[in-house]
Amino acid sequence: MKPFAFDYEKPATIAEALALLGEAGDDAKVLAGGQSLGPMLNMRLVRPRRLIDITGIPDLHQITDDGDAIVFGACVTHAAIEDGRIPDPTGGMMPNVAAGIAYRAVRNRGTIGGSLVHADPAADWITTLAAIGAEVTVTGIDGQRRIAVDKLMVSTFETSLVAGELLVSIRVPKLSSDAKWGFYKFCRKTGEFAEAMSAVIVDPARGDIRVVIGATDTRPVVIADAATLISKPESIATVIEENGLANDAYDAQVRRVSLWRAIEQVMP
């Protein structure tokens, strides 16, 4: 199938993009890489009257060192992160995660910002960046605001952005040199959507211990008492049950295994 006819716009600045979004309202879609939106357009799952391609905006490709964090422009590609072409604030976690996203052709075009706004529960970045404690900056006609990544996704394919807002950057805290991380996802074969995913951060210098379970039926689950879970991994099954992640025996098992294998990576 092919998409319905739409007007194609390629703004050169964030201000131009916001103006176009303001004019089009709910009839517009933003193209940041197209690896998810493209197939949805072709299958006519979305039918925008205007497509706004933001990949030509230089500010959205910038990388900035912000002291205790690295700020990624929304249009930084998965491949750029995988290849180490930009600074890594996570001690190898982000390149590792990027390398496991779909296929190289997808990683060449797909973007970190596009993935976050698409809000697919099975996507890698929403879970990973929630565990790291990252924030996104969104811009609209009323100014800028920051949203913690673990609060960005409201439900499946829905974010807390409002009409006319554009995600412009992602602020990723620098992990300390003695930080440990774990990440594990389960797919039936390479390139498929994850059926289970877990991310763990233990950063003593920042006093930060976070465990996030992704690839759920909705937004990632941030475990409230992560320190206890890591010190008592035998409680994994209970955590899965208490967070409503044991929909059936299969789901419960793959999520238990995913969580254990991520935790195992940070254990002494």
Identify the meaning behind each predicted range.
Residues 1-268:
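C-terminal structural segment of proteins
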